[in-house]
């Protein structure tokens, strides 16, 4: 299982705090997970944004980060302000 959490605007857009997904062989990296989620269509396309940030097991990482069964993943937009 992969536990996925959505934060800030992603949570609002998707109407979902998080979900648990079965891990499988075509989910080797965070990029592949993100592609599968965005492919759901509709509001899920928000996860295809260039400025998406992610964390694996509470550590910030790149989308190239390998995924393993039991990981906790978080997706959130970049922080901006003025």
Language-model features: where?
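Ubiquitin-like/PB1-type beta-grasp interaction modules and other compact soluble beta-rich domains
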Residues: 1-81
């Amino acid at each position: 299982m992969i536990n996925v959490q959505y934060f800030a605007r992603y949570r609002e857009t998707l109407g979902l705090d998080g979900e648990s997904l079965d891990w499988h062989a075509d989910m080797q990296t965070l990029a592949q997970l993100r592609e599968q989620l965005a492919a759901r269509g509709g509001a899920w396309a928000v996860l295809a944004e260039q400025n998406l940030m992610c964390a694996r097991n509470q550590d910030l990482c790149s989308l190239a980060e390998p995924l393993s069964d039991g990981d906790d993943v978080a997706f959130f937009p970049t922080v901006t302000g003025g």
